[in-house]
Amino acid sequence: INLTDKCLSCHKDGKIPHKNYKGEEELITGYQNSVHYKALKDGNFDAPTCYQCHGAHEMESTDNPDSKISKKNIANTCGQSGCHTSQLTDYKGSIHEIGVGKDNKDAPTCNNCHGNHGIVTKNVENKLEKSRDIVTLCSNCHSSVELVERNDLPTQVSETFSESFH
């Protein structure tokens, strides 16, 4: 936890050592309110820290294919040892992973649906507001005329969701 707090102490104000131009304060407070940070504070030292996902000072842009948080690598980062291994297994070979592998910018990976830093527990009372209902989430893409046409997506995701593996 000391390492995570150390990262947060420098990055919180967005001035030292550099500003995150996507909204530093939101990223920090999102992580501090996340299930990951709570688990860390509660003594689960396997919970993800800044360092585990981003590395220390060797951080690379999400545009760099070698980055741990690039679109092609984020699922492996989330599924690294002790973390979301069963979810990674489900994702591997899925239509979404195949799309990401083909550099389809529309294809989602973990953080497109679950977010980056403000990840909430599945037991949060107001989960719908925090992480959006899964059917609605899927429908955001699968009901978009532009995305459906561009990617030849099935349009009846909401109707068939409960009949699928979910």
Question: Where do the model's predicted regions map?
Answer:
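Short sequence/structural segments immediately N-terminal
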Residues: I1-H166
